[in-house]
């Protein structure tokens, strides 16, 4: 049983170690660590544990009052279990059907549970950024920074902050940011409205509402729980719109952002489409210039010399050389109209006003044209809308974008949103492969195709218990809670293995199946309960954890506790009933195969079947 249990647990966790993508890199250590730890525990169980038992365990030693009370409790539970087990085996089909109905009903909780990549953590740190219109001066940005700092100083939950205006990224002096550190949860004041201390998420929601009232600025708050996974901005909602025409992308990105702000699906909506400083464009009329004998080179040199300056010579001073550049005075090149008054020389030597052959326009410049997969793309990002889960925000934002985009343009998740969808696909694949590999290992261990199915019947009910506990505890379905389900798969089937293996041992003595189940299951009830109680006790501190970063531990531990509780209670009844049913199926099939018409007889060659049937007839 120990070897079978260890092999089955390792079979569950090895697929996790070989997952691909971002999640695979993150959980590689997890799968390897669990697998190695379980293998070492098997080595310890077959070597050191027998030695310790021989040295310290004394049979017949008088138990203390606590030990006697525990023994009486387990004896009563075993006696009660024995009384119930008989009717369960008598109504085995009803028991299995009822348990399957419970499992199917519990799957509806998947849609009710909020889904997110990783849970938002109350780390007490977040980033505040503000952007003003391009072209705003440093003085204007500094005034905005002072307003933001004044507000941060007024919040009693804030411990310290640092930051400033200008010089942060490509937006230059028209933006600024601040890194904010909050007081520890224990040190935060009690909110008079709610009568309790506010979490980081609640404080950020209040700040977002208050700072949005400041006119002329686009302010965003972001916590960093997802940035370590995806890098970049680390916004929980990120997607790109892609297409061939940059002007269409720019126009539609504005419409999408406005729609998301209106419907509330995404907060702090922003994009990487940043219009730069306005630029003056000199557009020549080539036909008219050709008629007047003016070359494009002459137009370019005239504008460059007047605005940028032309080198007229060099000045030497003490062995050093300095370029002498000649250009118009500052007051002569302040306005776009000044360019039109410049004179350009024709091939005949005549001077013509530049405005006669060019058109002067002012237009905003682009800081960059971004591409993804060789397509022009604009990234739109933001935080989760208030009262929504990450999955709801992502799905709603993508649906909104796809309604606005014309044919030939598309919206695709990126960053955290892409990692969110890929993570559940990867974990689902690991979940499936773990079951497949565990089945193959158990089939080899028990030399049976049906008994591994009986053992693995504990897994659906562990999932049911985990989903129910996550739902009632107000948790989400995230990477950590799904990883807890995989961990639960490895632990929950240990109980089934103990029941099936011990029943097989008793039947090898010639005991009939029904009597073997009635004898084996009550005897194995104590180690099953001890294993489950130890697992629940070990996970309870993490399930009740508070403080910075406790959210990641809590979702995994709560699912583990709920899954162990439900699977333990249901397994001790479903596994004996399923064992009885599948044993009848196996016996029936063996009898039919002996006659040549079993379930697997079709796999045999026709001649072989005829020979078997002839042999049976002859006998």
Model regions: which residues?
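Transmembrane alpha-helices and their membrane-interface boundaries in multi-pass membrane transporters
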Residues: 1-18, 25-67, 178, 461, ...
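Residue-level signature of catalytic and energy-coupling elements of molecular machines
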Residues: 2, 15, 30, 41, ...
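Transmembrane helices with small-residue packing motifs
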Residues: 17-26, 100-137, 185-191, 222, ...
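Hydrophobic transmembrane alpha-helices and their membrane-interface caps
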Residues: 18, 36-40, 44, 437-524, ...
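Hydrophobic alpha-helical segments of integral membrane proteins
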Residues: 23-26, 30, 62, 66-88, ...
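N-terminal membrane-entry
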Residues: 32, 421-437, 558
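Signature of alpha-helical transmembrane segments and their immediate interfacial
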Residues: 66-118, 145, 210-213, 239, ...
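Surface-exposed amphipathic alpha-helical segments in non-transmembrane regions
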Residues: 96, 108, 112, 127, ...
């Amino acid at each position: 049983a120990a070897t079978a249990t260890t092999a089955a647990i390792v079979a569950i966790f090895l697929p996790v170690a070989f997952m691909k993508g971002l999640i695979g890199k993150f959980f590689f250590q997890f799968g390897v660590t669990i697998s190695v730890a379980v293998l070492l525990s098997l080595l310890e169980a077959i070597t050191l544990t027998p030695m310790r038992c021989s040295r310290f365990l004394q049979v017949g030693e008088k138990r203390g009052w606590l030990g006697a009370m525990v023994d009486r409790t387990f004896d009563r539970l075993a006696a009660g279990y024995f009384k119930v087990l008989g009717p369960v085996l008598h109504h085995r089909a009803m028991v299995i059907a009822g348990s399957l109905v419970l499992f199917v009903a519990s799957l509806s909780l998947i849609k009710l549970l909020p889904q997110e990549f990783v849970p938002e953590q109350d780390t007490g740190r977040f980033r505040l950024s503000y952007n003003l219109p391009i072209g705003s001066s440093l003085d204007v940005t500094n005034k905005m920074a002072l307003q933001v700092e004044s507000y941060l100083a007024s919040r009693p939950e804030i411990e310290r902050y640092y930051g400033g205006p200008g010089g942060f990224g490509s937006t230059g002096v028209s933006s600024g940011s601040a890194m904010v550190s909050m007081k520890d949860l224990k040190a935060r004041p009690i909110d008079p409205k709610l009568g309790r201390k506010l979490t980081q998420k609640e404080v950020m929601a209040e700040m977002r509402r208050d700072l949005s009232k400041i006119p002329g600025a686009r302010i965003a708050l972001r916590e960093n729980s997802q940035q370590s996974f995806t890098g970049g901005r680390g916004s929980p909602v990120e997607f790109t719109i892609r297409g061939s025409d940059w002007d269409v992308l720019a126009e539609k990105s504005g419409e999408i952002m406005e729609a998301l702000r209106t419907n509330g699906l995404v907060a702090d909506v922003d994009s990487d489409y940043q219009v730069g400083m306005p630029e003056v464009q000199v557009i020549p009329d080539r036909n008219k210039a050709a008629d007047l004998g003016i070359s494009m080179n002459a137009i370019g040199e005239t504008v460059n010399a007047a605005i940028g300056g032309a080198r007229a010579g060099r000045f030497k001073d003490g062995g050093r050389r300095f370029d002498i550049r000649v250009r118009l005075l500052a007051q002569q090149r302040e306005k776009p109209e000044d360019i039109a008054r410049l004179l350009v020389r024709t091939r005949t030597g005549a001077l013509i006003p530049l405005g006669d052959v060019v058109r002067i326009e002012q237009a905003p410049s682009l800081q960059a044209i971004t591409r993804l997969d060789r397509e022009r793309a604009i990234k739109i990002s933001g935080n989760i809308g208030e009262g929504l889960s990450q999955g709801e925000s992502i799905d709603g934002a993508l649906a909104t974008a796809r309604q606005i985009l014309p044919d030939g343009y598309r919206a695709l998740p990126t960053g955290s949103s892409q990692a969110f969808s890929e993570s559940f696909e990867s974990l689902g694949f690991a979940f499936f492969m773990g079951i497949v590999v565990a089945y193959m290992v158990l089939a080899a261990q028990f030399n049976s195709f049906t008994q591994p199915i009986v053992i693995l019947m504990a897994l659906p009910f562990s999932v049911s218990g985990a989903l129910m506990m996550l739902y009632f505890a107000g948790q989400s379905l995230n990477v950590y809670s799904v990883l807890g389900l995989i961990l639960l798969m490895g632990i929950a089937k240990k109980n089934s293995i103990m029941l099936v293996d011990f029943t097989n041992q008793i039947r090898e003595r010639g005991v009939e199946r029904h009597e073997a189940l009635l004898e084996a299951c009550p005897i194995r009830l104590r180690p099953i309960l001890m294993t489950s109680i130890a697992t629940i006790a070990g996970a309870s501190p993490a399930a009740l954890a508070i403080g910075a970063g406790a959210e990641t531990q809590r979702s995994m531990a709560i699912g583990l506790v709920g899954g162990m509780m439900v699977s333990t209670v249901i397994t001790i009844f479903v596994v004996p009933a399923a064992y009885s049913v599948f044993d009848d199926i196996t016996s029936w099939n063996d009898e039919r195969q002996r006659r040549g018409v079993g379930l697997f007889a079709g796999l045999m060659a026709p001649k072989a079947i005829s020979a078997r049937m002839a042999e049976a007839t002859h006998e």
